[in-house]
């Protein structure tokens, strides 16, 4: 009976692993050597994982938050889409769902929560109040849309939107995450260099 040899695994020293510079250097070398296929497949794999495990942070101030709670019930089963891990801490969340009216006094709090989230981070504006100010848009104390404070990725209209509309908006965000470039290329927050 032949004993299998233990495979030799090349490891990266911890000092090189702490930051992504060594990984980015390896990707740059692969790109220069003509291995774009490998990087493209790696992009697809990472984006598949990220898109199917988006953890929401809910910032609910009105009736849209109640509709979001219906998503967690057995009838709609949020877990099958990868959104079941709702977080109370912005440091653990991938996206923030702004549900309801945002007042001028609440705007700095929302901005602070967004700033505490790790990159890449996404914003979904849910309901007429978050999208455009809703019926309170002419009031002196209401922000007319979350996009005045944060960069919004997906808008879910409705007053309040049905749970199916929530899912449609979340699936739109999943599609958006799947086509982002993780290695190389231009992401949504970056700009293409001029002249290229």
From Swiss-Prot:
SUPFAM superfamilies for the chain: HydA/Nqo6-like
Annotated GO MF terms: 4 iron, 4 sulfur cluster binding; iron ion binding; NADH dehydrogenase (ubiquinone) activity; NADH:ubiquinone reductase (non-electrogenic) activity; quinone binding
Residues annotated to bind [4Fe-4S] cluster: 63-64, 129, 159
UniProt keyword annotations, A-Z: 4Fe-4S, Cell inner membrane, Cell membrane, Iron, Iron-sulfur, Membrane, Metal-binding, NAD, Quinone, Translocase, Transport
EC supergroup of this enzyme: translocase
GO cellular component terms listed in the entry, alphabetical order: plasma membrane; respiratory chain complex I
Xref: InterPro entries: NADH_UbQ_OxRdtase-like_20kDa, NADH_UQ_OxRdtase_20Kd_su
Reaction(s) catalysed by this chain's protein: a quinone + NADH + 5 H(+)(in) = a quinol + NAD(+) + 4 H(+)(out)
GO biological process: aerobic respiration; electron transport coupled proton transport
Cofactor note: Binds 1 [4Fe-4S] cluster.
Subcellular location field: Cell inner membrane
Membrane topology listed for this record: Peripheral membrane protein
Entry cofactors: [4Fe-4S] cluster
Main location group: membrane
EC number in record: 7.1.1.-
Subunit structure: NDH-1 is composed of 14 different subunits. Subunits NuoB, C, D, E, F, and G constitute the peripheral sector of the complex.
UniProt function note: NDH-1 shuttles electrons from NADH, via FMN and iron-sulfur (Fe-S) centers, to quinones in the respiratory chain. The immediate electron acceptor for the enzyme in this species is believed to be a menaquinone. Couples the redox reaction to proton translocation (for every two electrons transferred, four hydrogen ions are translocated across the cytoplasmic membrane), and thus conserves the redox energy in a proton gradient.
Similarity comment: family membership: Belongs to the complex I 20 kDa subunit family.
Protein name: NADH-quinone oxidoreductase subunit B
Organism: Bacteroides fragilis (strain ATCC 25285 / DSM 2151 / CCUG 4856 / JCM 11019 / LMG 10263 / NCTC 9343 / Onslow / VPI 2553 / EN-2)
């Amino acid at each position: 009976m032949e004993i299998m040899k233990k495979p030799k695994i090349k490891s990266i020293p911890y000092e090189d692993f702490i930051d992504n510079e060594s990984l980015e250097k390896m990707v740059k070398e692969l790109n220069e050597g003509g291995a774009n296929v490998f990087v493209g497949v790696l992009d697809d794999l990472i984006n598949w994982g990220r898109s199917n495990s988006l953890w929401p942070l809910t910032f609910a101030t009105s009736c849209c938050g109640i509709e979001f709670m219906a998503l967690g019930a057995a009838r709609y089963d949020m877990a099958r889409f990868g959104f079941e891990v709702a977080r109370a801490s912005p440091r653990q969340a991938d996206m923030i769902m702004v549900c309801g009216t945002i007042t001028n006094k609440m705007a700095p709090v929302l901005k602070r929560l967004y700033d505490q989230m790790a990159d890449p981070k996404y914003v979904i504006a849910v309901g007429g109040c978050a999208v455009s100010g809703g019926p309170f848009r002419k009031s002196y104390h209401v922000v007319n849309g979350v996009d005045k404070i944060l960069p919004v990725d997906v808008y879910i209209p409705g007053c309040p939107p049905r749970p199916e509309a929530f899912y449609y908006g979340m699936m739109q965000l999943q599609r958006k995450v799947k086509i982002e470039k993780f290695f190389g290329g231009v992401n949504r927050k970056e700009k293409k260099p001029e002249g290229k």
